[in-house]
UniProtKB/Swiss-Prot annotation:
The gene is rpsP. Pfam families: Ribosomal_S16. SUPFAM superfamilies: Ribosomal protein S16. This is Small ribosomal subunit protein bS16. InterPro entries: Ribosomal_bS16, Ribosomal_bS16_dom_sf.
Length: 119
């Protein structure tokens, strides 16, 4: 079951309000959700309220962000977003080091086989 943090449309005509929810990927936009993580009202002076500790928890559990939800979290809970980006960058750096080490081992092995063939 893949989970996404996304916006769920609420409200009435000409006054749309959004809820930030954790939902299954296959559920419809305004359908069933697992947990309410906050809300966003583009019409009021207090635009949003987010539960940053729950957002961070679900992101650590493997939930993915939609583009609009990422923008809202970056604006409303910058600490959560910066930690998420730092985690992604360290993961990317580790994978890059592993790839580099693998390529070096592979090139050494090819050089050894080329020497063995030339003898």
């Amino acid at each position: 079951m893949a989970l996404k943090i996304r916006l769920r449309q609420q409200g009435r005509r000409n006054h749309v309000v959004y809820r930030l929810v954790l939902a299954d990927v296959e559920s419809p936009r305004d359908g069933r959700y697992i947990e309410l993580l906050g809300w966003y009202d583009p019409h009021s002076t207090v635009n949003y309220q987010l539960k940053s500790e729950r957002i961070f928890h679900w992101l650590n559990q493997g939930a993915e962000l939609t583009e609009k939800a990422a923008v809202l979290i970056k604006q409303g809970a910058p600490g959560v977003y910066s930690e998420l980006m730092a985690k992604k960058m360290t993961r990317k750096a580790v994978m890059c080091q592993k790839r580099r080490a693998y390529r070096q081992r592979r090139s050494l092995k090819r050089a050894e086989t080329a020497q063995a063939v030339s003898k």
